[in-house]
Amino acid sequence: MTTAKINLLDFDRKGLRAFFSEELGEKAFRADQVMKWMYHFGCDDFDQMNNINKKLREKLKHKCEIRAPYVSEAQHSSDGTIKWAMKVGDQDVETVYIPDGDRATLCVSSQVGCALECKFCSTAQQGFNRNLKVSEIVGQIWRAAREIGLEKETGRRPITNVVMMGMGEPLLNMKNLIPALEIMLDDLGFALSKRRVTVSTSGVVSGLDQMTGKIDVALAISLHAPTDELRSQIMPINDRWDIDAFLASVRRYIASSNANRGRVTVEYVLLDHVNDDMDHARQLAELLKDTPAKINLIPFNPYPGSPYKKPSNSRIDRFMKTLMEYDYTVTIRKTRGDDIDAACGQLVGDVIDRTKRTKVKQQGEAIPVKTV
């Protein structure tokens, strides 16, 4: 019987040091050396780690591996966006590279599929399979950095920002999200500024409260409606944690955070004649009066079978101007990669639905929201 090798990408620095000490009988600085090779140099071959002695390299080759998801398909948009289908086990998740001037953002997935069933999101329609491991989260960044490195002749910018806005709800995968974020921020990891790593949540209050005081990164919240009645219609998670509970948790987090500079980014997808009336804008402005926020409006990105439409430019403009009358900073997200279905809300991947979703829908029952 062959013993499975330990994937070193599953460890943050603390975990890697413990593994080296307890399982390999090595000192902490050896773990630090290997971590630097993995993340600073994108190395997955122990023999190339030339400041590691041969005995340890042989031990590592026997017991360990450095294995990231691999690219099963790549699609290139006319605007420079790249969508990679990355193989995790027997399925794919989608990772999106978005260049924009002097920055390049990587949109990273946290789950295979999603359990939350937001009505306007194509990922939610695919069902939920499982949480991604630490190695499968940071491995998306590792693999993307290597892919970009192979294309240096094209002048593509290295990754400067990471947003946890791909497939899945990050805060329903807290066990693996926290160490993955630690690796992103670690000087021996990807060494990203905490202001350049963003976690987006649809309202998992228990997870956000776990993050408070534990990990400091930029926070974005998927709000998408100004009232509980409307939000529950398009985001079933609101039946578990309503808007007041969600925003109270947000205020607790930003009060303990330096990365957010005292305010949160509110994401609001605009659905034609659903949540984009002027009354909705005024309700949203009133709702956020006690929660320091900048508002990012996202015109709906259509996908096959969706019942929703993108609002007209005039409706989008009126909504934005109404919010600005209340002195909010308001931006409209530029649609990127929509020609390859890589825009916000369009990520699907290759998901085998292992929830009870299909059966439940056939029986007309309510679908429970999974909690941490």
From Swiss-Prot:
Provide a GO biological process annotation.
Answer: tRNA methylation
Q: Which PROSITE patterns match?
A: RADICAL_SAM (PS51918)
Q: What is its main location?
A: cytoplasm
UniProt binding sites for S-adenosyl-L-methionine: 168-169, 200, 222-224, 301
According to its UniProt record, this protein's enzyme class is transferase
Where located? Answer: Cytoplasm
Q: Where in the sequence is the active site?
A: 94, 344
EC assignment: 2.1.1.192
Q: Which GO terms describe its cellular component?
A: cytoplasm
Which cofactors go with this protein? Answer: [4Fe-4S] cluster
What are the disulfide bonds?
107-344
A GO molecular function held by the record = rRNA (adenine(2503)-C2-)-methyltransferase activity
Radical SAM core domain location is 100-339
Can you state which reaction this protein catalyses?
adenosine(2503) in 23S rRNA + 2 reduced [2Fe-2S]-[ferredoxin] + 2 S-adenosyl-L-methionine = 2-methyladenosine(2503) in 23S rRNA + 5'-deoxyadenosine + L-methionine + 2 oxidized [2Fe-2S]-[ferredoxin] + S-adenosyl-L-homocysteine; adenosine(37) in tRNA + 2 reduced [2Fe-2S]-[ferredoxin] + 2 S-adenosyl-L-methionine = 2-methyladenosine(37) in tRNA + 5'-deoxyadenosine + L-methionine + 2 oxidized [2Fe-2S]-[ferredoxin] + S-adenosyl-L-homocysteine
* Keywords in alphabetical order: 4Fe-4S, Cytoplasm, Disulfide bond, Iron, Iron-sulfur, Metal-binding, Methyltransferase, rRNA processing, S-adenosyl-L-methionine, Transferase, tRNA processing
Is 4Fe-4S tagged as a keyword? Answer: yes
Q: Spell out the InterPro entries in the cross-references.
A: Aldolase_TIM, Methyltransferase_A, RlmN_N, RNA_MTrfase_RlmN, rRNA_lsu_MTrfase_RlmN/Cfr, rSAM
How does the cofactor attach, per the note? Binds 1 [4Fe-4S] cluster. The cluster is coordinated with 3 cysteines and an exchangeable S-adenosyl-L-methionine.
Binding positions ([4Fe-4S] cluster): 114, 118, 121
**One Pfam entry name:** RlmN_N
Miscellaneous comment as given in the Swiss-Prot or TrEMBL entry: Reaction proceeds by a ping-pong mechanism involving intermediate methylation of a conserved cysteine residue.
Q: Which family does it belong to?
A: Belongs to the radical SAM superfamily. RlmN family.
Q: Which NCBIfam families match?
A: PRK11194.1, rRNA_mod_RlmN
Q: What does this protein do?
A: Specifically methylates position 2 of adenine 2503 in 23S rRNA and position 2 of adenine 37 in tRNAs. m2A2503 modification seems to play a crucial role in the proofreading step occurring at the peptidyl transferase center and thus would serve to optimize ribosomal fidelity.
Q: What is this protein called?
A: Dual-specificity RNA methyltransferase RlmN
User: Origin organism of this chain?
Assistant: Aliivibrio fischeri (strain ATCC 700601 / ES114) (Vibrio fischeri)
Q: Which gene encodes it?
A: rlmN
